[in-house]
């Protein structure tokens, strides 16, 4: 039985075909791709920075674990509940306006977070942060797929993911968490 499963000879690998499509440097020279990559990184970076720091800030302000958990629950609702209609907003308003709305919601989040230290401030700020992340990331993803060819999908997604998660690593360190 084992002889039937293992080939008698294994063929030597041939020369690998060159990867299809343009290099990442060529993709980055396209404004749509660059904006998509920056939008995704901005959305994730701001979200990660503030989300990671909020439980620590709440603890310093005298709030317990239950309060921090409630705030993070509202943040997660803000991140994912808009997913039911963000695509419709993009179709109706366009990709860039939805991304801009995400940036404005992130700025509103920062304004609310800086305006007070009550549970309502933390909750409203992180809820808006979640919605802003959704609009930025969904918009960025929608924009990105217009900027590369099908054969470049893996390379393009890899470049975007690398930039996004490198940004997240930096904001994790910057958050103090």
What residues fall within each predicted segment?
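Juxtamembrane intracellular "pre-TM" segments in multi-pass secondary transporters
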Residues: 4-36
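Structural signature of the two symmetry-related core transmembrane helices
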Residues: 97-111
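Paired small-residue
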Residues: 109, 120-128
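Pair of pore-lining "gating" transmembrane helices in MFS-fold secondary transporters
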Residues: 29-47, 127
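Short amphipathic helix-loop junctions that connect adjacent transmembrane helices
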Residues: 52-69
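A late C-terminal transmembrane helix in Major Facilitator Superfamily
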Residues: 152-177
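Intracellular juxtamembrane helix-capping segments at the cytosolic ends
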Residues: 135-148
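Helix-to-loop junctions at the C-terminal end of transmembrane segments
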Residues: 82-95
């Amino acid at each position: 039985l084992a002889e039937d499963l293992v080939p008698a000879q294994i063929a030597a690998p041939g020369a690998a075909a060159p990867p299809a499509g343009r290099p990442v440097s060529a993709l980055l020279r396209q404004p749509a791709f660059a904006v998509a990559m920056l939008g995704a990184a901005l959305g994730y970076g701001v979200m990660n920075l503030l989300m990671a720091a909020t439980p620590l800030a709440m603890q310093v302000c005298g709030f317990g674990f239950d309060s921090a958990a409630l705030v993070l629950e509202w943040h997660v609702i803000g991140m994912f509940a808009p997913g039911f209609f963000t695509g419709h907003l993009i179709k109706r308003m366009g990709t860039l306006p939805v991304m801009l709305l995400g940036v404005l919601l992130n700025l509103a989040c920062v304004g609310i977070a800086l305006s007070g230290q009550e549970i309502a401030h933390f909750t409203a700020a992180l809820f808006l942060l979640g919605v802003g992340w959704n609009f930025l990331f969904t918009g960025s993803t929608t924009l990105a797929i217009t900027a590369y060819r099908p054969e470049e999908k893996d390379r393009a997604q890899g470049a975007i993911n690398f930039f996004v998660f490198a940004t997240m690593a930096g904001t994790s360190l910057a958050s103090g968490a």
